């Protein structure tokens, strides 16, 4: 199994290469480099304790890799990419529910307002046939954010960054494109995925459980 330090070097090298590909408009290099950082996280988690939580986070990362590839291909595969990330959010949601089922009403209200507001902004600019897929995605990511906030710790931070990244995608694609969007989107996405993956490591998961008063991950 690759050492964590080697995986980190690989992820950072691929991330740098992808940023370069964005700046130079090199589609092939972008396609090859984009999924590598999340693949490195998948490999890294193989060394974490084999808990149900780790399993669901790993599944979510796997679907995220599929989404990365689909959205990097120079074709209109947005709906397929959306579906892949929808599955990723559902996997994360399942993992978070395995940690705690406490209602966390403030988190629920915040997540619902966030999802409704974002969907409202996007719909007001015309989603057309994408309205239903985007609405379903907004529902899934809002539920994922709610349960992540209920868990606290790195899970909450990662989910928040993931939602921010997806919000930037929606704004750039449907509302008002802006030059810095590709860079802000990918950086918040990678940081979010790193935080989510880190929450599945032994030390981070223990911290989450202590903060949330949840039951042991091992019993899920």
Per-range role (PLM):
Residues 1-220:
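Polytopic alpha-helical membrane-helix bundles and their juxtamembrane interface segments
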């Amino acid at each position: 199994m690759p050492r964590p330090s080697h995986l980190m070097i690989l992820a950072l090298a691929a991330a740098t290469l992808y940023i370069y590909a964005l700046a130079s408009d090199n589609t092939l290099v972008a396609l090859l480099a984009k999924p590598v950082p999340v693949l490195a996280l998948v490999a890294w988690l193989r060394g974490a304790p084999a808990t149900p939580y780790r399993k669901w986070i790993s599944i979510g990362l796997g679907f995220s890799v599929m989404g990365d590839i689909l959205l990097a291909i120079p074709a209109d595969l947005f709906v397929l990419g959306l579906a892949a990330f929808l599955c990723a959010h559902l996997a994360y949601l399942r993992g978070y529910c395995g940690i705690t089922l406490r209602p966390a009403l403030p988190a629920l209200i915040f997540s619902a307002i966030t999802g409704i507001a974002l969907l409202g902004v996007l719909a007001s600019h015309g989603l057309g046939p994408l309205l239903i897929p985007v609405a379903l995605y907004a529902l899934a990511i809002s539920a994922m954010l709610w349960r992540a906030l209920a868990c606290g710790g790195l899970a909450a931070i990662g989910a928040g960054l993931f939602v921010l990244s997806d919000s930037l995608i929606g704004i750039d694609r449907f509302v008002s494109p802006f030059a810095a969007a590709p860079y802000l989107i990918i950086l918040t996405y990678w940081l979010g995925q790193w935080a989510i993956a880190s929450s599945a490591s032994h030390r981070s998961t223990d911290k989450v459980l202590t903060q949330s008063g949840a039951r042991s991950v091992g019993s899920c």
